[in-house]
């Protein structure tokens, strides 16, 4: 892995760990209830799914294998693969639905929900 990729992933993980406790909170609410304590080594689905993607690419000679990638994502959801505490958390509704579809045998190209409400973050 090149230094650029490694540095990018480390930056993502650090930013994710620092931002995760404040996720979904407004600046206004943080004025009255600031994040004062943070658990060490905790990151969200953003870092875990990035690590899954990199593991898949690395194991497949840096070629994208959608089935391998989805298997790793499903392993993350079901078993906490590449999570800090062995459990997936902070999963978005669209991501969860797509992975559940995959686990239930829906063809890969049909796993993602297809309506305008599923185009957001998560």
Predicted regions and their residues:
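Structured, active/binding-site neighborhoods that engage oxygen-rich ligands
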Residues: 1-122
